[in-house]
Amino acid sequence: MDFSRRSFHRSLSSSLQAPVVSTVGMQRLGTTPSVYGGAGGRGIRISNSRHTVNYGSDLTGGGDLFVGNEKMAMQNLNDRLASYLEKVRTLEQSNSKLEVQIKQWYETNAPRAGRDYSAYYRQIEELRSQIKDAQLQNARCVLQIDNAKLAAEDFRLKYETERGIRLTVEADLQGLNKVFDDLTLHKTDLEIQIEELNKDLALLKKEHQEEVDGLHKHLGNTVNVEVDAAPGLNLGVIMNEMRQKYEVMAQKNLQEAKEQFERQTAVLQQQVTVNTEELKGTEVQLTELRRTSQSLEIELQSHLSMKESLEHTLEETKARYSSQLANLQSLLSSLEAQLMQIRSNMERQNNEYHILLDIKTRLEQEIATYRRLLEGEDVKTTEYQLSTLEERDIKKTRKIKTVVQEVVDGKVVSSEVKEVEENI
């Protein structure tokens, strides 16, 4: 129940004048308080109405009239006071009902004991373990795929290396074939030379035989004259010597050609052996480097997969906590707004209660004063004022405080507080 304006006026005055020489006689001036109440308890005012009573020469009759008016005013005041006391009791009952409702609301919205989510926690842990197993399996599959790719790359490199070795050996064989062809041509030339020398030797033998035969024929027709002369040349021996000489030369050239071919072959074989050993050492180093690279690549992939899973888990945790923080922030804002509303209601009801209690106290004081007046305790000859309560304006204001917060990802980015004061 709202009271926008309450004013109380109370003044009692009594005056007793000496009789004057007139037909009017004695006059008595009194004040009778009256209470005005608006709709819904608004604009309640207790004011005084002034009554003028004319007395004649008979003071006894005037006193009875004064007593009757006072009784009627007190009866009217008592009736109105009873109605206001009834309103006060009604407001107290409504206040107690509101207190009960507030208590029930606190009991209803108070944080309760949490449910038993242990079964759900177990399911969540099982699902998390399954997710981790699946992530590990995926990581293993990725590592196997990477290992297969690395093995394929290794085999491809081996193939390229073997292909290069084969091309090198083929090039060496082609060079050796050229050398062999050169040696074959040189051997053929030597054989041709030997054949020509054999032909020359045969021709020389034939000519020598013809000469010998001619000499025999010539000697057969002539006289045998023995002359003591130096022995003649033996052409057969000479031819044999020439043949042996040319055979030795041919054998020597052939041996030199063979030795040169063997030397070149040995040099090439040594070069091939050295290159093969160097290639094998390089291949061993390359294999070790590949193994190291594969192990490092596998370790890198495992760390990357672990990092990715941890980042994903961190993002999920951040999102979950951000949503929970936003929910808690909204709940806190709503609870603060409700608490502010409840506090404002309680303050308003407390003010109303104190105002009504003040009204009740003052009315009881007025009733006691009127009772003393009726009993004749405070009758005096002079006019006096018992108490005067100046009209006062009781203004009640309502202050509404609005808190606007902008929450992004669970963090308060901006906060704005607005206060609005309203007259009730």
Swiss-Prot record:
More details: There are two types of cytoskeletal and microfibrillar keratin: I (acidic; 40-55 kDa) and II (neutral to basic; 56-70 kDa).
SMART domains named among the record's database cross-references: Filament
Site (Cleavage): 228-229
Function: Plays a significant role in maintaining keratin filament organization in intestinal epithelia. When phosphorylated, plays a role in the secretion of mucin in the small intestine.
Tissue-wise expression: Expressed predominantly in the intestinal epithelium. Expressed in luminal cells of colonic mucosa. Also expressed in the Merkel cells of keratinized oral mucosa; specifically at the tips of some rete ridges of the gingival mucosa, in the basal layer of the palatal mucosa and in the taste buds of lingual mucosa.
Keyword Acyltransferase: no
Variant or mutagenesis effect after changing residue 14 to A: No effect on keratin filament organization
Entry-linked InterPro entries: IF_conserved, IF_rod_dom, Keratin_I
Region (Coil 1A): 70-105
GO molecular function terms listed in the Swiss-Prot or TrEMBL record: structural constituent of cytoskeleton
Phenotypic consequence of residue 4 to R: In a colorectal cancer sample; somatic mutation
Protein's recorded name: Keratin, type I cytoskeletal 20
Stretches the record annotates as Tail: 378-424
Effect after changing residue 80 to H: Leads to collapsed filaments
Subcellular location: Cytoplasm
Ranges where the record places region Linker 1: 106-123
Region (Linker 12): 216-238
All copies of domain IF rod, residue ranges: 70-381
Protein keywords: Apoptosis, Coiled coil, Cytoplasm, Intermediate filament, Keratin, Phosphoprotein
Modified residues (Phosphoserine): 13
Region (Coil 1B): 124-215
Membership in a protein family: Belongs to the intermediate filament family.
GO biological process, alphabetically ordered: apoptotic process; cellular response to starvation; epithelial cell differentiation; intermediate filament organization; regulation of protein secretion
Gene Ontology CC entries for this record: cytoplasm; cytoskeleton; cytosol; intermediate filament; intermediate filament cytoskeleton
Residue segments, region Coil 2: 239-377
Quaternary data: Heterotetramer of two type I and two type II keratins. Associates with KRT8.
